[in-house]
Amino acid sequence: SNPLNLVRFRNLVNLLCRRRLDNEHDIFIKFISWNSLYADFIHAAFPDVPTLFLYRDPVEVIASVFRETSAVLLARDSRQAEFLAGTTAIELAAMDDVAYLSSCYAHYFSVILDAQPQPKLLSFAAFAPDALEKILAAAFALQPDRHQLRQMHEQFSVYSKDDRNQTGFKDDSQSKHELLSDDHLRLAEQYCRGN
């Protein structure tokens, strides 16, 4: 975190968030999970912007990674893995993929819980259409009009990673828990319990 990097980051975000239509006033930026390790840097760049950390049961995230490999798993054999997991190369060498991913998620949670100021926290399980208005008000002091709220509600029925909005959303929490063995479930619990 130095002045030049903060300026670069602000410029990049401002470029990505430039207004395209006259009626655009608010923007949401979604960072991937490992960007939580930069919470203090992001806050230093945008100290007046409210933040929300949406967290999910690590078991469900790990199961998703095994279904669709993510960058965090691809980084497993790089030096970046030490940063992501908050551990040493020697400790990483002794971990299987579930232990590595659990260590990463525990590290993300730890950084967010220590961040100053701490972002608002929201469980993925509580992120539901009927709660959206309260969530936006509490986390961002934002009150969307009926049209905006209706558009947001429509998105809840669609799988978030389908850019064509053709795949319906369905709760897969139980099936994700069933993908991991009992040993792996215990391992995830062991790493992430305190967070």
Spans of model-derived segments:
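Conserved two-lobed SF2 helicase motor
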Residues: 26-32
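PAPS-dependent sulfotransferase catalytic core
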Residues: 1-12, 67-101, 147-195
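PAPS-dependent sulfotransferase catalytic domain
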Residues: 33-126, 133-146
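Active-site donor-binding segments of glycosyltransferases and PAPS-dependent sulfotransferases
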Residues: 15
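A general structural motif
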Residues: 24-26, 48-49
